[in-house]
């Protein structure tokens, strides 16, 4: 399993834990996951993101992906929703397949028969088409996002609190309010479309069905790795 992480390292930790737990659960005993991970420095990436220099981020991440491939990974995960904006460039830089986080999430929605879904994430993920467009065009889902003021609040909490490992109860209340608004607008479930959000809000906090993309992406990686190992 190839992991492209560090955006932020806080959420990459969640991937590492979930994948190893998943392998242990499936194979038992002392089994753990075979992982090749490249963890980037998030500060320059975040600067490029907010400057709108996606080409710059694609270059950095494509180089990291090539190193993961060289380390022997059979397939690749980008351990962040937002940087799937440059997934096509990263995919083109390597020969190994990329497991896309939106596709993994859409599979779970299809399995549960959910058609209309709310999306929380960074402003980039909520506003641009690389993620919600893929859910709509490829998977036929109706995607609802919060109104602008709430989008700014969600984005700010991610970068100024969660990426730094800070959990504020006030922010949690705000997120739960925004989730309720999306549900009232017809969302049958809400995608926590940023790998940090699961640190703040969990299923136990709300009756609205939440989809934690870190957990879903990690489960998909485990199933893929074990399937490949058995096929091989």
Which residues does each predicted region cover?
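Non-catalytic structural scaffold of enzyme domains
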Residues: 1-232
């Amino acid at each position: 399993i190839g992991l492209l992480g560090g955006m932020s390292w806080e959420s990459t930790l969640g991937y590492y834990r979930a994948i190893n737990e998943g392998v242990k659960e499936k194979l038992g005993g002392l089994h753990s996951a075979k992982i090749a991970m490249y963890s980037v420095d998030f500060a320059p990436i975040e600067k490029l993101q907010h400057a709108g220099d996606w080409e710059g981020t694609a270059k950095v991440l494509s180089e990291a992906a090539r190193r993961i491939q060289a380390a022997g990974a059979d397939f690749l995960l980008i351990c962040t929703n937002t940087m799937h904006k440059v997934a096509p460039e990263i995919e083109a830089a390597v020969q190994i397949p990329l497991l896309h986080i939106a596709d993994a999430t859409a599979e779970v929605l299809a399995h549960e028969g959910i058609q209309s879904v709310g999306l929380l994430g960074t402003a980039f993920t909520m506003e641009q088409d690389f993620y919600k467009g893929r859910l709509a065009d490829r998977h036929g889902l109706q995607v609802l996002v919060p109104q602008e003021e709430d989008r700014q609040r969600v984005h700010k909490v991610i970068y100024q609190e969660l990426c730094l490992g800070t959990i504020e109860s006030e922010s949690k209340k705000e997120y739960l309010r925004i989730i309720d608004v999306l549900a009232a607008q017809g969302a049958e479930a809400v995608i926590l479309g940023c790998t940090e959000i699961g640190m703040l809000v969990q299923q136990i906090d709300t009756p609205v069905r939440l989809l934690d993309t870190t957990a879903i992406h990690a489960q998909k990686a485990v199933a893929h790795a074990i399937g490949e190992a058995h096929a091989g």
